[in-house]
Amino acid sequence: MSLSLWQQCLARLQDELPATEFSMWIRPLQAELSDNTLALYAPNRFVLDWVRDKYLNNINGLLNDFCGADAPQLRFEVGAKPASSLQKGAVSPAAAAIPAAQVQTARVAPTIVRPGWDNVPAPAEPTYRSNVNVKHTFDNFVEGKSNQLARAAARQVADNPGGAYNPLFLYGGTGLGKTHLLHAVGNGIVARKPNAKVVYMHSERFVQDMVKALQNNAIEEFKRYYRSVDALLIDDIQFFANKERSQEEFFHTFNALLEGNQQIILTSDRYPKEINGVEDRLKSRFGWGLTVAIEPPELETRVAILMKKADENDIRLPGEVAFFIAKRLRSNVRELEGALNRVIANANFTGRAITIDFVREALRDLLALQEKLVTIDNIQKTVAEYYKIKVADLLSKRRSRSVARPRQMAMALAKELTNHSLPEIGDAFGGRDHTTVLHACRKIEQLREESHDIKEDFSNLIRTLSS
């Protein structure tokens, strides 16, 4: 029995799993076959537990498919594969089975013979300004389907900085939790290693620091500062657009940090390749580690966010009230929290109980604006324009993929962004049955997990309709 068995499993798993999941959880595994036992080595306990919980049945099923009654037993271990099992010049089984161009982790940083994370001697200078907000942690980040992968990736980076997911690139619309996760990673790293030099900043601060260094003839000090941190967390990297000198300096800083196994985490409001005004060589490097999207929170997550926020403020928020708010405000977490703050303030000022009628009154203008902005008619026009078809096509009986997929997308958006029932949505799409609408919604939900393009389309349309 040879390692080709694991390579066969990898090939099948790559076909069956979304690219991000495969890159994040399966690709880091190393395998060793011995005495009819397949040992899988995970880089840390977090990955081991996740793989065993989520993918154990998939892997066992593949082993049975390939080997039948002779299928090896499966064993999980934390750490690197024993040196005795490594053949000189051999590549990782995962790397051999997976063409780099097929996954989002298009390049894994090589192991550099340099001081690693745990033994870099601390420089005598300069003094580091962390700017990490201690209030933003993993514990108070509300997890849901829309952000589950992003949170898991961030947690793993906090536990193993400078490891497989370097850089980590988080992208999504405004107010979805990207900044919270940046701070949570910073806090997690410092909790693990109190003396770690972790620096968080907005990309504009990097530009300002560089300009100031040039003005003061202190560019070498600038380079030494940014290239000797243990973790650099930069928010809204899209603001580097058209700033050529800043991009040039960040390019060299990025390379220096990566070669030193120092962690880089970046956020943006869009996918790396879609950032205009940024050099291709930088955009390429942004995708070298792991790229994960954060989508607008689904209804259940929005309710959970409201309940947690109310609990943090010692406010009793009835479940039906949280549901009422969450059903009507859908674009992002910041909008939800702002609405709840207004409700709480009004309740404190008036001494009234928080009920649905009270919330309807307190948020009257916000709710009216939301209902005015997002209608089925508006969704149909926006989707038709996005896919370059006619609204009449969405209402027609045509079943070609070029029309059917946009129609399904529009139906799913109508369910997500309006209060209309399934029969009402069906009527608005040429008198279709509610079961057709339900099928469309489920199909788009499935495709969002399997296809990066569909996930991007959905997020872009949500952002357009909610802005």
UniProtKB/Swiss-Prot annotation:
Gene Ontology cellular-component annotations: cytoplasm; plasma membrane
Keyword Protein biosynthesis: no
InterPro entries linked to this entry: AAA+_ATPase, Chromosome_initiator_DnaA, Chromosome_initiator_DnaA-like, Chromosome_initiator_DnaA_CS, DnaA_C, DnaA_dom, DnaA_N_dom, DnaA_N_sf
Residues holding ATP: G175, G177, K178, T179
Region ranges (Domain III, AAA+ region): 131-347
Location of this chain's protein in the cell: Cytoplasm
UniProt xrefs under PROSITE patterns: DNAA
Stretch list, region Domain IV, binds dsDNA: 348-467
Pfam families on file: Bac_DnaA, Bac_DnaA_C, DnaA_N
Region span, Domain I, interacts with DnaA modulators: 1-85
An annotated GO BP: regulation of DNA replication
Chain spans, region Domain II: 85-130
GO molecular function: ATP binding; ATP hydrolysis activity; DNA replication origin binding; lipid binding
Entry keywords, A to Z: ATP-binding, Cytoplasm, DNA replication, DNA-binding, Lipid-binding, Nucleotide-binding
Biological role stated in the UniProt entry: Plays an essential role in the initiation and regulation of chromosomal replication. ATP-DnaA binds to the origin of replication (oriC) to initiate formation of the DNA replication initiation complex once per cell cycle. Binds the DnaA box (a 9 base pair repeat at the origin) and separates the double-stranded (ds)DNA. Forms a right-handed helical filament on oriC DNA; dsDNA binds to the exterior of the filament while single-stranded (ss)DNA is stabiized in the filament's interior.
Subunit organization: Oligomerizes as a right-handed, spiral filament on DNA at oriC.
Family that this chain belongs to: Belongs to the DnaA family.
Entry remark concerning the domains of this protein: Domain I is involved in oligomerization and binding regulators, domain II is flexibile and of varying length in different bacteria, domain III forms the AAA+ region, while domain IV binds dsDNA.
The protein's name: Chromosomal replication initiator protein DnaA
Organism per entry: Klebsiella pneumoniae (strain 342)
Gene label: dnaA
